[in-house]
């Protein structure tokens, strides 16, 4: 009889928490754990009920146009293949353009009776590595996907652009060193900042002044197509310190 009552009392008696859950009053998600939850451990994970606050589209730092996100790995591969096909088409088109120009120059030389050596100009080598051209195209696309470039092409049409006055996209097909190309891209993007939208009130952004930067290309006949553009800052001669008043004051004191 006593064993029967002991069994009933043990069934209704609350079980003590397991050895692995002693002293743990909260679950892994921070919520209070129930008293009858004996199997819960810190390794239990529950999916978050709140969805990730991640936008469906993103823009480049200076762009107002939404760019579709890459949904999966297949989309990234397809986009890369499309870029390669476009690069191959651009290379073929540029080669045809060079051949047409060369044929036109030969026709003009033959009609005028001049020799080839008289009109021999140094032409730069053509970049034929698809990987290099693809990398350059990505850098150009990044610079063109900005508000400043959109404002520039609207304000200055192609037929009104002048050399050494308006920014010109570097030629991705010419043979440049990596350092020279990166410098040209950087200076091109700096020049595009002239068409940035006006800064809003309270913003820390400073307007880009054309007087602060002068872009020049230092090149020689030997490295005509491998020269590195340099950045030269203007120095106003009017701000030079005048020593003449100091000499006059020294003579008066002596």
From Swiss-Prot:
- Any one Gene Ontology BP term: mRNA transport
Q: Which domain of life is it from?
A: Eukaryota
Task: Kindly state which keywords UniProt assigns to this record, in alphabetical order.
Answer: Cytoplasm, mRNA processing, Nucleus, Phosphoprotein, RNA-binding
The molecular function GO annotations come to: histone pre-mRNA stem-loop binding; mRNA binding
Quote the protein name from its UniProt record.
Histone RNA hairpin-binding protein
The UniProt entry, under Gene3D superfamilies, shows:
Histone RNA hairpin-binding protein RNA-binding domain
Locations listed in the record: Nucleus; Cytoplasm
Q: At what positions is Phosphothreonine found?
A: 60
UniProt note on tissues of expression: Widely expressed.
Instruction: Give the motif span (Nuclear localization signal NLS2).
Output: 95-98
Per the UniProt record, the source organism is: Xenopus laevis
- Protein task: Binds the stem-loop structure of replication-dependent histone pre-mRNAs and contributes to efficient 3' end processing by stabilizing the complex between histone pre-mRNA and U7 small nuclear ribonucleoprotein (snRNP). Could play an important role in targeting mature histone mRNA from the nucleus to the cytoplasm and to the translation machinery. Stabilizes mature histone mRNA and could be involved in cell-cycle regulation of histone gene expression.
- Cited InterPro entries: SLBP1/SLBP2, SLBP_RNA_bind, SLBP_RNA_bind_sf
Gene Ontology cellular component list: cytoplasm; histone mRNA stem-loop binding complex; histone pre-mRNA 3'end processing complex
């Amino acid at each position: 009889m006593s064993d029967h009552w002991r069994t009933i009392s043990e069934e209704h008696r609350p079980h003590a928490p397991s050895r692995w859950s002693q002293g743990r009053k909260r679950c892994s998600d921070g919520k209070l754990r129930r008293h009858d939850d004996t199997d819960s451990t810190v390794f239990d994970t529950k999916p978050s009920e709140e969805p990730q606050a991640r936008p469906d589209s993103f823009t480049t730092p200076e762009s107002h146009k939404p760019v579709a996100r890459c949904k999966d790995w297949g989309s990234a591969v397809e986009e890369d293949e499309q870029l390669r096909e476009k690069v191959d088409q651009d290379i073929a088109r540029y080669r045809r353009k060079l051949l047409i120009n060369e044929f036109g120059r030969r026709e003009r030389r033959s009609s005028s009776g001049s020799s080839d050596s008289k009109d021999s100009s140094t032409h730069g080598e053509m970049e034929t590595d698809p990987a290099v051209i693809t990398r350059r195209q990505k850098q150009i696309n990044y610079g063109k996907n900005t508000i400043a470039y959109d404002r520039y092409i609207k304000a200055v049409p192609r037929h009104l652009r002048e050399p050494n006055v308006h920014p010109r996209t570097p030629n991705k097909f010419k043979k440049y060193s990596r350092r020279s190309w990166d410098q040209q891209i950087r200076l091109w993007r700096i020049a595009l900042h002239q068409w940035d939208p006006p800064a809003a009130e309270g913003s820390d952004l400073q307007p880009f002044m054309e007087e602060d930067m002068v872009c020049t290309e230092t090149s020689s006949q030997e490295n005509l197509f491998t020269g590195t553009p340099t950045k030269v800052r203007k120095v106003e001669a009017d701000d030079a310190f005048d020593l003449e008043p100091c000499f006059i004051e020294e003579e008066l004191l002596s």
